[in-house]
Amino acid sequence: MKSLAGHVVKYGKHRERRSFARISEVLELPNLIEIQTDSYQWFLDEGLREMFEDILPIDDFQGNLSLEFVDYELKEPKYTVEEARAHDANYSAPLHVTLRLTNRETGEIKSQEVFFGDFPLMTEMGTFIINGAERVIVSQLVRSPGVYFHGKVDKNGKEGFGSTVIPNRGAWLEMETDAKDISYVRIDRTRKIPLTVLVRALGFGSDDTIFEIFGDSESLRNTIEKDLHKNASDSRTEEGLKDIYERLRPGEPKTADSSRSLLTARFFDPKRYDLANVGRYKVNKKLDLKTRLLNLTLAETLVDPETGEIIVEKGTVLTHQIMETLGEYIDNGLNSVTYYPSEDAVVTEPMTIQVIQVLSPKDPERIVNVIGNGYPDDSVKTVRPADIVASMSYFFNLMEDIGNVDDIDHLGNRRIRSVGELLQNQFRIGLARMERVVRERMSIQDTETLTPQQLINIRPVVASIKEFFGSSQLSQFMDQTNPLGELTHKRRLSALGPGGLTRDRAGYEVRDVHYSHYGRMCPIETPEGPNIGLINSLSSYAKVNKFGFIETPYRRVDRATGRVTDQVDYLTADIEDHYIVAQANSLLNEDGTFANDVVMARLQSENLEVAVDKVDYMDVSPKQVVAVATACIPFLENDDSNRALMGANMQRQAVPLIQPRSPWVGTGMEYKSAHDSGAALLCKHDGVVEFVDAKEIRVRRDNGALDKYMVTKFRRSNSGTSYNQRPIVHLGEKVEKGDTLADGPSMEEGEMALGQNVLVAFMTWEGYNYEDAIIMSRRLVKDDVYTSVHIEEYESEARDTKLGPEEITREIPNVGEDALKDLDEMGIIRIGAEVQDGDLLVGKVTPKGVTELSAEERLLHAIFGEKAREVRDTSLRVPHGGGGIVHDVKIFTREAGDELSPGVNMLVRVYIVQKRKIHEGDKMAGRHGNKGVVSRIMPEEDMPFLPDGTPVDIMLNPLGVPSRMNIGQVLELHLGMAARQLGIHVATPVFDGATDEDVWETVREAGMASDAKTVLYDGRTGEPFDNRISVGVMYMIKLAHMVDDKLHARSIGPYSLVTQQPLGGKAQFGGQRFGEMEVWALEAYGAAYTLQEILTYKSDDVVGRVKTYEAIVKGEPIPKPGVPESFRVLVKELQSLGLDMRVLDIEEAEIELRDMDDDDDDLITVDALTKFAEQQSAKQLEKEAESVVKEEAQDVVQEIETAEDRD
């Protein structure tokens, strides 16, 4: 028997799939959220300490007191993760820092532990809990500090160069040439200064010294001619210093001293200027002589300074081989020259640089100096004079065609700032603010009694951390629609945010796909719209190194034997540029050598066919190019990239269903993505399941200890979907560390399960699937196939008001007993009650202002001592479309010790659950960007059926496929049908999945027709349709855009205060905008009255709309419309400009415009309907009250009279 296509692979303990992959993967996928967890761990272990050591010790102004850092410790968190969620608190731990205060005068030392505020902790899932809500800190993609060179062309077509030294924080130093070939520098974006002025200020004043350092070049000569010695009484260095000061501080008196201190502060003070580790690494790498000298011709003989032997002869071309031997000598300081700056320079320490002379590639007669910065140590975080001189040398070398310009969009020049670093930067801001306070307190307070505790004010530190988590652009409310959305959010990279780009200024180049993204950033997954290309996703295998550059793994190729080894190297983008990398699908022999002599490979931006002996590396996996969500799309290689983008983005919007089913046609990523998302309950230690029910799982460890795992049931997720876990292990089952114990939402058997496998036919039906609409069988509604559970939270708080406290009570004015039937004695709804729109959830009354009493009422009060308890009903009611079943009620009170915000005495939260079946108007999609809206749900018996009588579930329009070029859906359809017939699950990994032959092979094996199509019969008549139709199984998901959330209608409602027009949007209970084009449509029909009422009563004719409402209620004819408010505003604006504007009618009589006087205040500010209703009921009550009061007053008068008679 012929062997079947594919081979069986096990995913987790519970699922087997037939995989069509041909490439064996040598490397497991990394933990998908380690970009979050590792970064935060680094911050706790090293980042915090680095921060304290940077800022402390703090000395006072006299230098007598010194506050030093000893150690820090994070204590036990106040709340667990679950408690923090329940109490709306932060999941955080108190940070205690041990400080030592030394008094240098007395020699006294005081040590003390100081509380530094609560520090938010990261949960195991890579999220933070801030005010009870889960948040994610998105990693930021920024330009790396370092030295960059760029080419530019001026308006006359002359080529020039520019250079920029960018620190992590501090002033920029830019160099540029002008049309006359004079070189200039700019300090911190100010006016430009001739480049030699800065060299002189650094202490190398004479022209001869400058030529000695840099060698002869045309641009340098032009610059020196421009930079004349103007004032003979100043030395050249002092004059240079004054020139710079004049540019940086124009208008201030210039002295050499002030300029020295200014330049020192700008560039050489570690507190003000910081290159950071990454900046120092990039500067050293760019100015490294080993890369700059490659392929140049030596103009001098290089001699070993220790032995005197010749290393390389003059006139030699420096090839790779020669550079390998020369490299060691360069690292050890070959050809180092030390220059001593003059006494009046900014930096007086000697400057050591490496100078090697080569011939210019432009003019082989000319000798050029190539200067290296002498490799300052990693601990040197500021820029040194040697760096400035070496970067100037690089700048001059570019004019001789030595060196190369940088591409800023290359991922070697962009780096990731993850949580740890973002937090560290924020913490630094707080500590710097605190430092000022400490200095001030040191000078004010008595030094004898001073303790560290008295010096420290932790407010600025706490505030900066709070501000970062609460309101930073990078601290985002977690997308928790489903586990894939969660996972993707944690792996997101944003170029926006503080210190990044802005949407409006980001050009096309920044957003575009770059060749260096390969294996580092997904080229497909990015939002559509204004953020396209600015927000990206980390590729599946990518990691972030200690400098923040993204690395991707490659298998090393042994050049000697030609074998592809299993050794994996992680390369950053700039290192990868030097190598030739073969594709992952290159065919290999048994022994690991390449099967063909020529393979497809990449070198920088080129795709080449390369002989195998030239290849250095090979991709580890075909899916290393794409992100996790993209890797979940089967047959991705057959889809157009625009549609794949939609497919990846829409999977994140899938609503978790009641009965999740993982796809029959998967990619093999379903298990890993669900496992790492944080939604599954994972086993922490090996052991045996000892107890399992819906609430709890207990595992007995091998060492006898017992682990308890709580299963989360029906919790509301951030996006209002149900977060529910279901155990999948059995009593007595052996489990290992990392096994899935319980499925989370949208998971089945440990795999991601976003949708359902449904029977789909590509056919039109009576025009109901025009324009991507979807026709669906009622079976999917009846059997709850696409039913989801949604939980909404409503809260009501009882506050203290000026007129007295609000009260949560059952006693509500003007509410019948029937409305109170589900409230308990406190006036709070019972759990399990079914509620409709407008029902009471929490009864609450607010004191009203005591009204002025009439004489009779005052008399009554005097006699009966009754206080008029005037209260307003401010109960919490179910909003429109919010009806369902009360799932939970939480009550927080001060007495119970709950932390409530000031002025709140009690807080009640009610959770209402809705079961939403699929509905016409709901949005659905496949995984290939094939989205549509359900247009008709048909009875099962009317749906077309297969020859065996099975009715299809969904009909899609075949016209949606060819123009969209997402053919993957058709392949999925056929393979899915075969999988259904064979009763198997299949995996077809991206770029290495089932080929056409595999699909047809599986179709044959399943006993389907050779074209995989079938005859379909009309469910209404039983007649077969004319042509054979493609029918198969496709994985369709229901998206979070449901019609229940969008449907909205208003008759009357709130109006905007300024324009008096109805508000807009469902959330404001607004109206529908009748815009300019809609007005044209009515004008075209001549519907004058309809148009008039739309522009008056229904919009901003304030008086007219109230009168109209009254007329409708009383059944009277509708009055004529008045003047719209917007017209009145226009007239008033013209009057305010001094124009005498009046409005006349047909008889030229003036029309009075309503003035904003007190009579109309109520009309303007209060919703007309409620106002009218209140007036009516008030009149009614007044009449009743009057008659009661009169009767009672008469009784009282009679009693008094009778009493008088008796007397």
From Swiss-Prot:
Annotated EC: 2.7.7.6
Please give the coiled-coil regions recorded for this protein. Answer: none
The organism's place on the tree of life at top rank: Bacteria
S-S bonds: none
Q: Its catalytic activity?
A: RNA(n) + a ribonucleoside 5'-triphosphate = RNA(n+1) + diphosphate
Query: What is this enzyme's class at the first EC digit?
Result: transferase
Q: Which UniProt keywords apply?
A: DNA-directed RNA polymerase, Nucleotidyltransferase, Transcription, Transferase
One GO term describing the cellular component: DNA-directed RNA polymerase complex
Gene Ontology molecular function: DNA binding; DNA-directed RNA polymerase activity; ribonucleoside binding
PROSITE patterns recorded:
RNA_POL_BETA (PS01166)
Q: Which first-to-last residue range defines the signal peptide? A: none
Please give the function described in this protein's UniProt entry.
DNA-dependent RNA polymerase catalyzes the transcription of DNA into RNA using the four ribonucleoside triphosphates as substrates.
The record's similarity note reads: Belongs to the RNA polymerase beta chain family.
The entry describes its oligomerization and partners as: The RNAP catalytic core consists of 2 alpha, 1 beta, 1 beta' and 1 omega subunit. When a sigma factor is associated with the core the holoenzyme is formed, which can initiate transcription.
Q: What is this protein called?
A: DNA-directed RNA polymerase subunit beta
Taxonomic lineage: Bacteria, Bacillati, Bacillota, Bacilli, Lactobacillales
Name of the encoding gene: rpoB
